[in-house]
């Protein structure tokens, strides 16, 4: 099954490092880097507001466990956001391409 994984990162440098590693290692077929994200969250009892970037990672359920570990190894956050969402439907040719380029 195909998935979109959401990952927030603190900088463009970190975004590019993670994106390139995932695609080069065939853990993802494509990664979109979306700038201009404002995140408001609770951390260590305080409400924090940060500027971040969002990675939209296209991968498969099979590749996700290795992808998650690779992101954790590259990510500067203690508890990085790594959330996988299933793709219910999509362009069949795109989903075929995604599977062919992951794993």
UniProtKB/Swiss-Prot annotation:
InterPro entries: Ion_tolerance_CutA, N-reg_PII-like_a/b, N-reg_PII/ATP_PRibTrfase_C. The keyword Nucleus does not apply. It is found in: Cytoplasm. One of its GO terms (cellular component) is cytoplasm. Pfam families: CutA1 (PF03091). GO terms for molecular function: copper ion binding. Keywords: Cytoplasm. It comes from the Bacteria. GO terms for biological process: response to metal ion. PANTHER family: DIVALENT CATION TOLERANCE CUTA-RELATED, FI09726P. Belongs to the CutA family. Homotrimer. Involved in resistance toward heavy metals. This is Divalent-cation tolerance protein CutA. It comes from Thermus thermophilus (strain ATCC 27634 / DSM 579 / HB8). The lineage of its organism: Bacteria, Thermotogati, Deinococcota, Deinococci, Thermales. The gene is cutA.
């Amino acid at each position: 099954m195909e998935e979109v994984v959401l990952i927030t990162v603190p900088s463009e440098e970190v975004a590019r490092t993670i994106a390139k590693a995932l695609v080069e290692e065939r853990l993802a077929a494509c990664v979109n880097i979306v700038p201009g994200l404002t995140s408001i969250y609770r951390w260590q009892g305080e409400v924090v507001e940060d500027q971040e970037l969002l990675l939209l990672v296209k991968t498969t359920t099979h590749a996700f466990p290795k992808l998650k570990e690779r992101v954790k190894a590259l990510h500067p956050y203690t508890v990085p956001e790594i959330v996988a969402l299933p793709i219910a439907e999509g362009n069949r040719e795109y989903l075929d391409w995604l599977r062919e380029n992951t794993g």
